[in-house]
Amino acid sequence: MAGAQPGVHALQLKPVCVSDSLKKGTKFVKWEDDSTVVTPIILRTDPQGFFFYWTDQNKETELLDLSLVKDARCGKHAKAPKDPKLRELLDVGNIGRLEHRMITVVYGPDLVNISHLNLVAFQEEVAKEWTNEVFSLATNLLAQNMSRDAFLEKAYTKLKLQVTPEGRIPLKNIYRLFSADRKRVETALEACSLPSSRNDSIPQEDFTPEVYRVFLNNLCPRPEIDNIFSEFGAKSKPYLTVDQMMDFINLKQRDPRLNEILYPPLKQEQVQVLIEKYEPNNSLAKKGQISVDGFMRYLSGEENGVVSPEKLDLNEDMSQPLSHYFINSSHNTYLTAGQLAGNSSVEMYRQVLLSGCRCVELDCWKGRTAEEEPVITHGFTMTTEISFKEVIEAIAECAFKTSPFPILLSFENHVDSPKQQAKMAEYCRLIFGDALLMEPLDKYPLESGVPLPSPMDLMYKILVKNKKKSHKSSEGSGKKKLSEQASNTYSDSSSVFEPSSPGAGEADTESDDDDDDDDCKKSSMDEGTAGSEAMATEEMSNLVNYIQPVKFESFEISKKRNRSFEMSSFVETKGLEQLTKSPVEFVEYNKMQLSRIYPKGTRVDSSNYMPQLFWNAGCQMVALNFQTVDLAMQINMGMYEYNGKSGYRLKPEFMRRPDKHFDPFTEGIVDGIVANTLSVKIISGQFLSDKKVGTYVEVDMFGLPVDTRRKAFKTKTSQGNAVNPIWEEEPIVFKKVVLPSLACLRIAVYEEGGKFIGHRILPVQAIRPGYHYICLRNERNQPLMLPALFVYIEVKDYVPDTYADVIEALSNPIRYVNLMEQRAKQLAALTLEDEEEVKKEADPGETPSEAPSEARPTPAENGVNHTTSLTPKPPSQALHSQPAPGSVKAPAKTEDLIQSVLTEVEAQTIEELKQQKSFVKLQKKHYKEMKDLVKRHHKKTTDLIKEHTTKYNEIQNDYLRRRAALEKTAKKDNKKKSEPSSPDHVSSTIEQDLAALDAEMTQKLVDLKDKQQQQLLNLRQEQYYSEKYQKREHIKLLIQKLTDVAEECQNNQLKKLKEICEKEKKELKKKMDKKRQEKITEAKSKDKSQMEEEKTEMIRSYIQEVVQYIKRLEEAQSKRQEKLVEKHKEIRQQILDEKPKLQVELEQEYQDKFKRLPLEILEFVQEAMKGKISEDSNHSSAPPLMTSDSGKLNQKPPSSEELEGENPGKEFDTPL
């Protein structure tokens, strides 16, 4: 497969994550360069990380789009106030040094026009945290490649942040955001029951995300999506089932170039997860159904991006030699405008490196100030000068902020002062420190035949490309000096002297920037001032190792020298000349060595050549003017947007392998490279312009010369509609893309007058097929918030027309044979020969063996086979004819072959079905319900016992009080007894009263005990009735659930069976194809004419055999399916038969329980009574009857742990 990879890439990109401190906001002081006024603000970031916004003391909110942020700097790298008064204002009353609390946020629409947001934090830690977080958000690759839905959410967030001081959303902001058609906006607002006057405002709570979505649907209706939705099965019903959605994703959205083992099609469970994520109606989602609204959300969601996130991530092998990569390279990096006049800028080095460039150019000249500081400028022009030291500091600051891979510094050294060159070398050593690669790596010595180290080996390293000082004899040096002076007339190549030994650093005049064609005036103009370089001093020469510039002489000489550390630069005209004359040799040269291409000197406007020209030859450092955002620069940005924006892209395999030769001008398919076929249909656009204008779309393809098609397609211009134009035109088809790994598709949108709106550049290899939104970018490759195109893309491996019939016959032989039979019947009326054959076929007296004799091929004449019939044999003849060579003759063998691919499929048993997750989940739920029911009844029992205990205590207290009173009276009476006048009848009366009191107390306790016993019986009966009812319901639900589970599992098994059948057919074809190949191999040993005869016969017989075998296999598969379906019915019936059995068992169980219950309660109370009697006899003189009833029943209900320890089958759960 074209898209197959050795392994599945594990995505390393992190989604946007905004920290709490950024969401809550922090106090800062904002200051301006040109003002002494400072403004206290509260700085925040929205939860999605779209905007950076702040509120001042007047409650006014300002926004900064994080997609415009280039860098965030703090401490010594941040801007510091120059005005002493301003500095004093900022430093008042704050903790920590002012320099450590400074933050500068750099933002702008491009690399040249940048602005600064200057802030001061109140604490150093806060400054560091905000700097790191803001930079992380601004450079997040997933945020730069958001889904369509995320961009619409960004627009919504912008509206929610730009509110009035009262917290309301001004409608003028909505009109301004969707300004293309005011009337449409007004109608859409009214449809949402919102005010529509431009001067109105609405409360934030009235403009919810749901209302916003309805507003968008009214503003930009999408009938084309309704049509797609209907086309895929939602014609009679307002939804797609999970199976229909699965077919849509696997058949339309999946890349057919991917390996099916490493990247299998989505399964039903995975599609169900997607439906649950995007379907707003939960009841539909649970049924596995998705509405048109959910379908629209899926199409605009993160899973349906036009480019896979894996391609954005660092997914290429970074361990190959440096020469195997394209390297993002800049020309005259310091310039901000044209080549002849304008400003040079240190900031350009920062911006270029932050954008992903890995090779920058430094034009160094002698400083003419008293300090003798070297400068960087464009020599002999009106461009300004900048400090060399400041440039080195800027490079050190930003070298590895966005990519860890090596930086290449391309020095164009015109400094003829040894002292200043020494300063340059010293600055490089001191400022770069350990990052500067001073010595070659041990594994990669500077020797012939040794490849360059890899980007992985050189991570976080800076390499210098500069002339290397020679260590030859003084005579040689003298000659070289003369030559060097003469070389001032050269323009961009190297010296005429060639090193005499293979040692490193032998060519101080072997500049990559001297032109060997020095007498050619035009060439000199093309190549600029690079040839006037000064001699390298010892100090600068010592910095050079793996990138040693030499004069290019020929590809043959370079091959003989075989020095990977030597490289040459070519002005674009010279590079084009070499590419035209020796394309294959140029590709070979670039496999081992580096080459750098740069714009010709006549491009004074800083325009660019097309980099694709030189990528096609494998040139690594194709240097462009980054300050000019023309089409060439846009293609360059599109190229290096992928592989983690690392600045390195691995070249196609054929441009790396030493055993393969590649011609960039090839027009045919290259053996070993799978070409692609790409089809693009532009369906519609959304919010393309903020004006009411017509729009159109253009499609280009860039790649090898054979693949490149400029303005290959252009749609019609929509009539005054930029909100939702629909084109629905025929797709543009790129039939054969020879080298897809180096081809890119550009889709651009323009207003009717030709004004550029936006575009997108997509590598062919990374494009996902299917229905997708393409969110547009501006010229600087920054994402636009609202403009998008909706397209349908088909991409697949290319099949030549000549093989289309063979591919069709092999992939679907039955349909192919049926088609051949149909054609035979259509031709039968035109040929007498065919009529005779039909008559013979109808003749009952003809023997089967005679029929095929007429169709046998005659001996070959001059290598061409002749047969008696031009059409395939009718099926009746094919069935009765004798087996052709290579066919399976014996039926037993046929059955053996079929049995070898036929898989045994067993139906799931009831026990296996009961282990299904949904059934087990329901069982657990029922178990919990029964536990809760028992707990409730235990609580009622406890409450009842508490109530009776209280009543008992009251009776006992009353009894004790009355008894105490009587006993007190008895004591008094006893005293009186001692007096002679006291009557005896008083004491007898008191005894009677005490006896009566005891009798009354005993009766009350007996009554209370009887009442307690009855109430306990009632409670337990109530519990049993509840349990019985609940278990009866549980049986119904479990039987129903088991039935549903059985149906679902059986349906899935039948679906799986279809997949198994297809695999079995493929396996059968594979085995038969193996036999066919063996026979073809055998036939190769014979003479050519005989071999051709047998090969033709083999193909014919092979197709017939495959048809017969597949028919037999299908019969066997059909019997297997019938048997499985029968077994499924049997299992479902067994499940239904379980229900009455379980219900009878339940009835019997509770009849027994009810019978035993009164006796159990009585025994229980009596047992408790005995225990309590013995207890009370030791502690109290009161009658113990009531206390006995509170024995065993008056205990806490069992805990959930205790209940879980019980047998659920016996206590709470149903027998099922």
UniProtKB/Swiss-Prot annotation:
Cofactor: Ca(2+)
Region (Disordered), start-end ranges: 469-534, 834-891, 933-993, 1071-1095, 1172-1216
Main localization of the protein described in the UniProt heading: nucleus
Organism: Bos taurus (Bovine)
Keywords on record: Calcium, Cytoplasm, Hydrolase, Lipid degradation, Lipid metabolism, Lipoprotein, Membrane, Nucleus, Palmitate, Phosphoprotein, Transducer
Record GO terms (molecular function): calcium ion binding; calmodulin binding; enzyme binding; GTPase activator activity; phosphatidylinositol-4,5-bisphosphate binding; phosphatidylinositol-4,5-bisphosphate phospholipase C activity
Compositional bias per record (Acidic residues), positions renumbered to this chain: 507-518
InterPro entries the record matches: C2_dom, C2_domain_sf, EF-hand-dom_pair, PI-PLC_fam, PLC-beta, PLC-beta1_EF, PLC-beta_C, PLC-beta_C_sf
A cellular-component GO term for this protein: nuclear speck
Pfam family, one: PI-PLC-Y
Record field: compositional bias (Low complexity): 491-501
Domain of life: Eukaryota
Ranges where the PI-PLC Y-box domain occurs: 540-656
Post-translational modification: Palmitoylated. Palmitoylation at Cys-17 by ZDHHC21 regulates the signaling activity of PLCB1 and the function of the endothelial barrier. Palmitoylation by ZDHHC21 is stimulated by inflammation.
S-palmitoyl cysteine-type lipidated residues: 17
Database matches in CDD domains: C2_PLC_like, EFh_PI-PLCbeta1, PH_PLC_beta, PI-PLCc_beta
Phosphothreonine, modified sites: 509
All copies of domain PI-PLC X-box, residue ranges: 316-467
Listed name of the protein: 1-phosphatidylinositol 4,5-bisphosphate phosphodiesterase beta-1
Post-translational modification Phosphoserine, affected residues: 236, 417, 511, 582, 887, 978, 987, 1199-1200
GO biological process, one term: memory
Active site (UniProt): 331, 378
